[in-house]
Amino acid sequence: MCEFKVKLSSENNVKDVCQDVLYAKIEENIILRDVLGTTNTVESAIITEVSVPSAKMTLLYSPILKNILKLLKFQTKCYEEGKFDTKMTEIWEAIKKEGDSFINSLQNKLGK
């Protein structure tokens, strides 16, 4: 069995999240479960690397990802139900607003 050590990368920072992880699931958040059955939830992140030989999993954090994952969840729901959910439009507007803020913040930090 392969237990993973999970790291979270954000901007120029990498930190350990948990270890001995056997299970990972992406919903609106990433749900991680270790060998003892302890569950850790990581918000606004995606899995960027899984390496069995190194027994490591790397996650990327960005605040904008929370609503992107939510949008994808609602998209799946729409297809399953065969109808459009107006909540998709609300989430999309939130993503655009967060995207503008994200770009402005990056420009302020790094220059234009």
Range-by-range predicted roles:
Residues 76, 82-83:
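Short, cationic low-complexity segments
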Residues 15-72, 78, 103, 111:
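Compact, glycine-rich, soluble single-domain proteins
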Residues 76-77, 94:
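Short secondary-structure transition/capping segments
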Residues 3-10:
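A short beta-strand micro-motif
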